[in-house]
């Protein structure tokens, strides 16, 4: 049928004559006429192709014989060959290993090969693609002992052979060939998939060999010429068959109720032709085999009712979860705590009570929902009105401010009443809230309770009667009220009284001036932090007054404006007289301040001016008229 296969010895013998003919043409030179070339072609075109071996002439005229042999070699070598150089070049092209044994996949499809050869070095192949070629035989695969997948579809194969070395072959594709009989496959112990679509299979005998393929699971026999319904007996004897494709065969029309029959007879089949075999389809097919179409209809109705019940139960479970969530939300809005067992009172459908596994699943779902809501309530507690949070804010404001003013109390020797003063702005800013009235009432009680503490300390520091203390504390009250207004006479009167009394009681008067600010009305302190700054400035002034003596008072600073610049320049300025000269601490009351002017007090003018400017911001306006007031008093 194929005479070319038996002619390679003749080709090897004719190679010298081919070289001679080439030499003859080489000697002929370029002067050969086109007519001669056409004549030689005509002589080799017809019967020369078939009768050239028998027409050997001993006369030495080898021209026509050489051309006939060359044309035959061209015809045989017309297609590409699977050479080692070609395979190595192909591996480089596909970025595979240059070392043949390291490659596990070789892509040789769509190359036009007519035979399998030169694969001895590729011992590590696991997948070999040879589809869409002109291969006529399965051969030269002895070195591929590790091969798992062999793809030989769309070739010119007529027989299944030479597969014994492939002991690990798992998938074999022989579709679109000219195979008429399935054979020589029992030597493949682990063959799982066999594709024989578009071949020449016709009878039961053609597929009888499949009984010996015990591990075959996927079988594709589509688009063959199988017409005998007895093929089901062969397929039924295959224990591991799961997927079967018989589409395109006449047998599908010859078997009555084809799909039901095949499903019933092949017990383990899960996929038939173009769609799966579902458990419902198998149950209906078995019911049809028992009682016909009526039994099949009843079985189908039962399956549909069970499926509908599953869907209904799922929807009811979702609705129950939603309903419980709404009930919990309503209970939280009402301020109630929902009981964890309250959900159990929700009635369930009688169908759900009949089936115990479904009831257990519902119980698990209910328990999960309850635990989820309890965890949410613990992590994110909700207050119904928010009054507790408001109360905490007010209390925190009252607690933090005493810590702020505690630094001021640490620097001062007397007991400080400023915590109540520092809390009063907080209460004023939070007046729009509901708990402000109670907070203000508590602060007022605290003020009334601590009101007498500065007087008691003054009484311990100086042996003065209670009436004198009342007088001393009353005068700074007038001063605190008038200092916030414009230039007022009570302030000037207090200044004159302080100049006339250079005794330690003046210091106590200054201390009482500190605490007298808190006894005034809360409306007088327009700026929130002025009452904190005043005691600090007054304390600095007192420390300077104690170091420099009682003589460093306001009238001395006022008399500096009356002294001429010449006398101030002539007098020396010893810094030691501030603490040594006792006469300077008691200025005369007759107004003769020029003769008793202390020069040492000039050193403390800057510090005292800064302290007075911080305590009394409007005092410079009063100093303008102090000179006239002094002369008026004289």
Swiss-Prot record:
The subcellular location is:
Cell projection, Cilium
Q: Which InterPro entries does the entry link to?
A: Cilia_flagella_integrity, Leu-rich_rpt, LRR_dom_sf
> Which of UniProt's keywords are assigned here?
Cell projection, Cilium, Leucine-rich repeat, Phosphoprotein, Repeat
| Source species, domain of life | Eukaryota
GO terms in the biological process aspect are:
cilium assembly; cilium movement; determination of digestive tract left/right asymmetry; determination of liver left/right asymmetry; determination of pancreatic left/right asymmetry; heart looping; inner dynein arm assembly; lung development
Q: Where is this region: Disordered?
A: 1-80, 326-358, 481-505, 559-634
The primary site where this protein sits is other
Report the residues modified as Phosphoserine: 349, 465, 488
GO molecular function terms listed in the Swiss-Prot or TrEMBL record? dynein complex binding
SUPFAM superfamilies referenced in this protein's UniProt entry, alphabetically:
Outer arm dynein light chain 1
Keyword Phosphoprotein part of the UniProt annotation: yes
Which regions are annotated as LRR repeats? 101-123, 124-145, 146-167, 168-189, 190-211, 215-236
User: One GO CC term of this entry?
Assistant: axoneme
Q: Which family does it belong to?
A: Belongs to the DNAAF1 family.
Described purpose of this protein according to its UniProt entry: Cilium-specific protein required for the stability of the ciliary architecture. Plays a role in cytoplasmic preassembly of dynein arms. Involved in regulation of microtubule-based cilia and actin-based brush border microvilli.
The name of this protein is: Dynein axonemal assembly factor 1
Instruction: Specify the species.
Output: Mus musculus (Mouse)
């Amino acid at each position: 049928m194929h005479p070319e296969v038996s002619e390679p010895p003749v080709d090897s013998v004719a190679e010298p004559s081919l070289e001679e003919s080439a030499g003859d043409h080489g000697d002929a030179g370029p002067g050969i006429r086109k007519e001669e070339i056409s004549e030689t072609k005509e002589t080799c075109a017809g019967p020369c192709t078939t009768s050239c071996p028998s027409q050997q002439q001993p006369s030495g005229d080898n021209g026509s014989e050489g051309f006939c042999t060359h044309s035959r070699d061209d015809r045989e070598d017309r297609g590409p060959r699977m050479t080692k150089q070609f395979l190595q070049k192909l591996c480089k092209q596909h970025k595979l290993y240059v070392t043949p044994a390291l490659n596990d996949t070789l892509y040789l499809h769509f190359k036009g090969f007519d035979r399998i050869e030169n694969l001895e070095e590729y011992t590590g192949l696991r997948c070999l693609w040879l589809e869409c070629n002109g291969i006529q035989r399965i051969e030269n695969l002895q070195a591929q002992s590790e091969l798992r997948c062999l793809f030989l579809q769309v070739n010119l194969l007529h027989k299944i052979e030479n597969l014994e070395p492939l002991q690990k072959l798992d998938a074999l594709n022989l579709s679109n060939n000219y195979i008429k009989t399935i054979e020589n496959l029992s030597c493949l112990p682990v063959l799982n998939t066999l594709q024989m679509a578009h071949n020449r299979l016709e009878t039961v005998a053609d597929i009888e060999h499949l009984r010996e393929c015990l591990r075959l699971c996927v079988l594709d026999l589509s688009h063959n010429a199988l017409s005998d319904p007895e093929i089901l007996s062969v397929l039924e004897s295959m224990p591991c068959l799961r997927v079967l494709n018989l589409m395109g065969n006449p047998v599908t029309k010859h078997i009555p109720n084809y799909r039901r029959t095949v499903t019933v007879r092949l017990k383990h089949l899960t996929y038939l032709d173009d769609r799966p075999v579902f458990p419902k389809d198998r149950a209906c097919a078995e019911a049809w085999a028992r009682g016909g179409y009526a039994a099949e209809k009843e079985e189908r109705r039962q399956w549909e009712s069970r499926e509908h019940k599953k869907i209904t139960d799922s929807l009811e479970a979702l609705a129950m979860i939603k309903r419980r969530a709404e009930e919990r939300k309503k209970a939280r809005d009402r301020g109630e705590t929902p009981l964890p067992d309250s959900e159990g009172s929700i009635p369930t459908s009688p169908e759900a009570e009949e089936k115990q596994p479904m009831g257990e699943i519902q119980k698990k779902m209910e328990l999960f929902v309850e635990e989820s809501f309890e965890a949410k309530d613990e992590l994110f507690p909700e207050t119904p009105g928010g009054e507790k949070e408001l109360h905490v804010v007010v209390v925190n404001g009252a607690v933090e401010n005493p810590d702020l003013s505690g630094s001021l109390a640490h620097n001062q020797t007397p007991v400080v009443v400023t915590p109540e003063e520092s809390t009063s702005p907080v209460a004023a800013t939070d007046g729009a809230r509901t708990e402000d009235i109670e907070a203000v009432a508590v602060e007022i009680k605290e003020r009334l309770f601590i009101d007498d503490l500065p007087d008691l300390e003054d009484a311990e520091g100086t042996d003065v009667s209670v009436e004198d203390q009342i007088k001393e504390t009353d005068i700074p009250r007038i001063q605190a009220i008038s200092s916030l207004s414009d230039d007022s006479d009570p302030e000037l009167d207090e200044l004159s009284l302080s100049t006339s009394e250079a005794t330690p009681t003046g210091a106590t008067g200054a201390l009482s001036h500190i605490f007298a600010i808190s006894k005034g009305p809360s409306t007088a302190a327009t700026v929130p932090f002025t009452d904190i700054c005043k005691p600090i400035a007054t304390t600095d002034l007192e420390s300077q007054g104690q170091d420099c003596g009682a003589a460093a008072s306001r009238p001395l600073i006022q008399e500096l404006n009356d002294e001429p610049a010449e006398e101030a320049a002539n007098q020396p300025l010893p810094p030691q007289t501030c603490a040594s000269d006792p006469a300077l601490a008691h200025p005369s009351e007759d107004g003769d301040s020029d003769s008793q002017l202390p020069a040492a007090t000039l050193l403390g003018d800057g510090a005292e001016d800064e302290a007075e400017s911080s305590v009394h911001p409007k005092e410079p306006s009063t100093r303008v008229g102090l000179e006239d007031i002094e002369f008026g008093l004289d």
